[in-house]
Each structure stands twice: as structure tokens, then as C-alpha cells.
């Protein structure tokens, strides 16, 4: 054997030895992380406290303020190296008195409808009533003549597509009816718009969510009705048995007000290089914000607690951020991004959990090809824990603005099973009782493990 071949052979042997050693060390560390989460985990009780002691946490509300203090106390309880509040400004919208809605049939009979105002909508200023004009798709409304719509209440009955395996794809296709429905209906002279709730089950829960107005387009009330009521109304409309729709909403917008993001850290050897993880502390005012996004909050809180408990010494500063105002403005995410840039920090990676507390399936990664190649190698370590999705593209609403300030940053998104998420999303049914303890704990363990590997290998 030549000296060159001998050196190459020895080099391969040494590389293989170290790779095997690293794999063994990492495999053991992941097992310790999962054991801590499943045996001594705090995530479920922390979620119980957030949901039951505080409840829904809409930006600008007293409950949102309580949640900020809750988050600060929780981080201090787990002895993070530093805990602090970052000032932001948030919009303030209130639902007011409970909404009411009815349909009147051609025979004069009234039937109650389960309805909720969309976030940001104006109120009806008393009882609003009118003839219904139905469209099965937002595009159909856009193509309608003004004479078909003017003076009427528009009903957009566009269902999420049950054929989609990933329910977020079905949601994404329908999101514009909620976000833009009021603008498109108002352009044609409608007096209000109601939409079919964005959810796959046929049930009685209306789902709220953000909507917007455009300058120069008259503002009209916007609301969602339950999928069960949408099915009923569609049948009545087709049979021409629906006389009119009546609704009353008391919601109002108020001036912006001060609020905070909550931040906790474990300092690394390279203290000015940051890897962050987080979710949004605010929620809509229906339900308890358990899956959206209480689960993401306690996932990341628990992940940092686990690494601290296991006495892991990070290379980079590991940071947890509880973002405020993701649901109706994203001022927490936007303010955080500009703030860390102004501090001169090197923000190298961020991970977000905002898809509920269901069984972990994997992660998405939005970064350079060189990082993605290392990222997919992590799959082997996660095989014992049944994670199998390692896809290109990732992140979330809260961490998205970091890309504007740090073009080379890598964003990660936690991907749990999606099949049940839109059963509860933005609805009264998004409560603590609908979160499974073990699934939640497995999610926290997966995130802690991913952050450990990011710190030790992906950005070493």
C-alpha cells in the first residue's frame, strides 16, 4: 500500500471513529432529554396553569398582561441565567357582548346560528339584517356583478379541502376568505360578510381569526359561522327557502397600547451568538389558547428547562422568547427582530412551535444548503422517537421577521401531527382538556433535542 493510500485509509478510520463517538454521545444525550421530559416533565402542569389560571390572552387585554407576568415568573422559577421583558406596542380589539345571529325562513320561522366576529371587525351598531347572497369560493365573489351583491349580506361557503393530507395546506387555500372577504364584499356594496369557519369537522363551533380592511374601502362587519350552520344555510339557500340573515355584534377597535415579549436565556461560551426558540403568548379570546399557542409556549419553556436541568453547557446563548401579538399584528415578532439587530447580536438560528401540542412528526429547515445537508443527518438520531419529516422550508410568523434583519439566519419549524389541529384552531374548543399530556411532553423533548443538536453540530 502506498503512503498516500495508507494515510487516506487511516484518515477514514479516524473520521469514522469520531463520527461513531459523536453519534453515541448524541444518542445518549437525546435519551436523557426524552427521559427527563417524560418522567420529570413540567410542560403539562405549566400549560394547565396558563390555560386555567389565566385563560384566553388577546393582545391588549388584562389576561395578556397576566400572561406576561406568568411567563416571567416561570422562567425565573427554572433559574434561567437572565429573564427580562422587551417592550412592544400592540393593537387592542375587543369582542364586547356575545354575538347573536339568526336566519329567517320563508315561512317566518327563526333559527339561531352559531356566529363569532372575526378579529379586527367593526360591530353592527345594533341589529343588522339583510338578504343572503352565497358564493362557494372567494374567486366567485370577485367575479360577481355589483347588482348581485349590493345591499346584501355575503355568505362565503368555501370549505377546507378534506383530500389534503397535511391540513395546513387546506387551511392555507381557504385563509383568504377570512383575511380578504370583507374587502371584496365591500367593493361590491355588501352590508356585511359571513364566512364558513376554517375547520374540517362539521360541528357547532365557530372559529375566529384575523381579518383586515383596506384604506378607501368602506368597512363592513365580518363574522364566521360554524361549519354545521354553514351546511344548513347552503342547503336552504339552494332551495330558495332562506329569507334573510340577522346578526348583532358589539366588537370595537381601540388605540394601540404597550405590552411586552418575555425573554429567558442560558448564556453560551459565544454569548453574543444566539439560537432562539419560541411561540406566541397571546391567543384569541375564544377557548383557552391551549394548542394555539399555549403548547408552543410550554414546549420551549420546557426545552430550555430540560437542558438547564441536565447541566448542558451550550456553545451559543440559548434563548426562549414568548412573543406577544402573533394573532393580530405580529408586533412581537417584528419588534424583536429589529431590537436584536440594533443590539449587534449575531442571531444564527431560530425555531418556532406554533402548530399545537400533538405527536411530533419532524422539523422544517429554511437555511443554506450546507446547513440543510447537516440538518437531514439528524434524522438517524430521531428514529427511535418516530420523527420522520425533515423538509426544506420552516419557521413561523413570529420568527419570520428575523430573515429581514439577518438574511443568513436559519429558521426551523416544529412539525407535529396536523390532523386534529383545525378541530380546535381559534375556537371555544381549544382548551386544556383537549391536549394530551404525553404528546405535549414528546414535543418538548423533540425541541430540546433539536436545539441541542443545532448548538453542538449544525452551527459549531
Features from the language model and the residues they span:
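N-terminal capping segment at the start of a domain
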Residues: 27-61, 205-210, 219, 282, ...
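Short helix-loop-beta-strand segments that form the rim/entrance of peptidase-like active sites
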Residues: 45, 305-331
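Extracellular/luminal Protease-associated
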Residues: 112-221
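Metal-dependent peptidase/peptidase-like ectodomains
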Residues: 110-112, 125, 220-225, 230-231, ...
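Bacterial Sec-dependent N-terminal signal peptides
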Residues: 1-27
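Soluble metallo-hydrolase cores and metallopeptidase-like ectodomains found primarily
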Residues: 28-30, 104-105, 111-146, 211-290, ...
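Noncatalytic luminal/extracellular "stalk/propeptide" segments of secretory-pathway proteins
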Residues: 48, 52-163
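His/Asp/Glu-rich mid-to-C-terminal helical/loop segments that flank catalytic regions of hydrolases
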Residues: 305, 309, 422-460
